[in-house]
Amino acid sequence: MRHVLSLVYKCSVFSKQVTVFSNHLRLSHSQQWGSNKLHRKIKIPNPFREIIMADPKIEEILAPLRANVKEQGDLVRKLKEEKAPEIDIKKAVAELKTRKKILEDKELSLAPAEDLFDRAKMEDLIKRRFFYDQSFAIYGGITGQFDFGPMGCALKSNMIHLWKKFFILQEQMLEVECSILTPEPVLKASGHVERFADLMTKDIKTGECFRLDHLIKGHLEKIKSDKNTKIELKAEIEDILIKLDGMNADEMSALMKRFEMKSPISGNDLTPPIEFNLMFNTQIGPSGLVKGFLRPETAQGIFVNFKRLLEFNQGRLPFAAAQIGNSFRNEISPRSGLLRVREFTMCEIEHFCDVKEHPKFESVKNTQSLLYSADNQEQGKPADLTTIGDAVCKGIVNNETLGYFMARIHMYMLAVGIDPKRLRFRQHMGNEMAHYACDCWDAECLSSYGWIECVGCADRSAYDLTQHTKATGIRLAAEKKLPAPKQIEVVEAIANNGRIGKAFKKDSQAINDTLATLDNAALEEMQKELDSNGEYTLITARGEFKLTPSLVNVKKTQKTIHVEEIIPSVIEPSFGVGRILYCILEHNFRMREGDEQRTYFSLPPTVAPMKCVVLPLSGNAEFQPFVRDLSQELITVDVSHKVDDSSGSIGRRYARTDELGVPYAVTVDFDTIKEPHTVTLRERDSMRQVRLPMADVPTVVRDLSNSKILWSDVEQKYPKFEQQETVKGTSV
């Protein structure tokens, strides 16, 4: 971990010197609907806000725009405090987004640009070396589905292995593997059946579907880019695009009619907007009677197993459960490679706790991160570089447990190769919060596609356990020992089981289970209804049933308790492996200075697909025993590697392994044959080499790959390699 800690330290020191310019990346050209965007270079803005702030003339231009955003942000807060009508709040939020976008665009236009990023070259390298490619390509491919090749699989596997060490091992989490097929009642209770949907429209003749917001955006951007479009209309379109995310079905439908939108593929008319649930539905079993879905997240499997996990943990809180697996979302129009797909791997943690202090918070409180709070977004301010400890102390981050996991996420992202200058945490604003969350921060990475959400860290409170308790009648709760016994008033439903059994037969169990879950408020409401109306309608998982005083009554008693029942809160870090993997590749894509055709990935050794390559200098038969011995010794110490004894110059073979992101290369040459047997070890990024005893190679490469030592340590210990002393058995 030495390399990782060094990187974190360097990031922390470096970050103190700059304030990062946190804007939403905007591509240099509009993305045309359905166009091939591969063959173009993309201008990535300089992420440093310090450059802008240092120029008073630039800040003078931005000051009134910041004031406009702050003014509107204050109005939004005021409307919320006054509990104004929802429509008024929505309009105010839409206007706030408009002003934010104007400010961000102006900041972006004033910021100096970094070098052009050649996405085409990177994607060519990814495809040519088979990191990943479109699934079923020989049949034309399926949009939003990808197959990982040998290098992609190894990179992904190493990322997950490091994730397990960072979280499961370090925090002693309970790992589970739950079913992908999920019965409908589970996802009804969680809210996914009702709320997990996007608006779409269809080609009335071909039936081809389009995600509505993407269709509108593509159509309007095409009009906007037309040189014949009037300035007034361009300005109006810009305003519409900014407000698009907050529009409902009626507003989008009006835009379709006004701009006479047709299918971008066929030119045919389109249907009115319809809601499309993003979950893949299926039938479980041959009868077709059991409806199910492919899970949209791995979390629900953990929640429904809460009682078993709590029991495994001897009934104690806090504890965390983790799961790694695939989830599925039937995206209407997947795009942007691995960033929006229909099948993806997630690493999710559910941390169950009753108090939100964390025992390890002290160890991470000085971690510096770039935080883009909801308040800063509303005020038109940039993200702040601050410590997690200060953020929790000031109430920017809700609690210690949430802050602890944000710090650990930050460290993990740096360890796998994310550029610290292009990493931030952005807090969800109230209008974009998921239905289950009371606070949420996304770890976002800046890429050529913009700021990409890669990790969500949500405070789900007790939402999920409460919902599943209501749906099943089974208490998903923990017991907490009280420091001293206390007297409480207990309100409970006393059921006449005999009469309920005769009256409702097979439904009697569902009735009794539901009665057991009613809280005091519901029981008091029941008593009120029974007294005034002579009956009470009980809603259960099997339907509604009318109960009378002869079947049930409500009783209040005094009771001494030694423990209290609590439904724990949940902090959920959720990692999108594919998105992180893509950002790692983009952040580590390099071109050799002076030779742009020599591209490679500067991946950290910890996650590199292979740790080293063994290369004989030529096809000389004398090299083969040494190559075999080296390979076997590397296998013995668990170092993944390959032997490249193909024809071609040593330089060409170095370049080939650099493309794969292999950090080290061991070369067997004529000096190896002599005693003592030595080889050269080459480092990928610097291309520098040292000469070391052949027997040292396995241990050195293993320790480099595990970040126990750095390349600088190796250079200090072993002599620099200039040239071999022997050529075909003759000393130079």
Swiss-Prot record:
The keyword Mitochondrion applies. SMART domains: WHEP-TRS (SM00991). InterPro entries: aa-tRNA-synt_IIb, aa-tRNA-synth_II, aa-tRNA-synth_II/BPL/LPL, Anticodon-bd, Anticodon-bd_dom_sf, Gly-tRNA_synthase/POLG2, GlyRS-like_core, tRNA-synt_gly. Glycine binds at E297, E348, E572, P573, S574. GO terms for molecular function: ATP binding; ATP:ATP adenylyltransferase activity; glycine-tRNA ligase activity; protein dimerization activity. Residues 61-117 form the WHEP-TRS domain. Its EC number is 6.1.1.14, 2.7.7.-. GO terms for biological process: diadenosine tetraphosphate biosynthetic process; mitochondrial glycyl-tRNA aminoacylation. Keywords: Aminoacyl-tRNA synthetase, ATP-binding, Cell projection, Cytoplasm, Ligase, Mitochondrion, Nucleotide-binding, Protein biosynthesis, Transferase, Transit peptide. ATP binds at R329, N330, E331, R340, V341, E453, C454, R579. It catalyses: tRNA(Gly) + glycine + ATP = glycyl-tRNA(Gly) + AMP + diphosphate; 2 ATP + H(+) = P(1),P(4)-bis(5'-adenosyl) tetraphosphate + diphosphate. The keyword Kinase does not apply. It holds the Pfam family HGTP_anticodon. Residues 1-27 form a transit peptide. Homodimer. PANTHER family: GLYCINE--TRNA LIGASE (PTHR10745:SF0), GLYCYL-TRNA SYNTHETASE/DNA POLYMERASE SUBUNIT GAMMA-2 (PTHR10745). NCBIfam families: glyS_dimeric, PRK04173.1. Belongs to the class-II aminoacyl-tRNA synthetase family. This is Glycine--tRNA ligase. It comes from Bombyx mori.
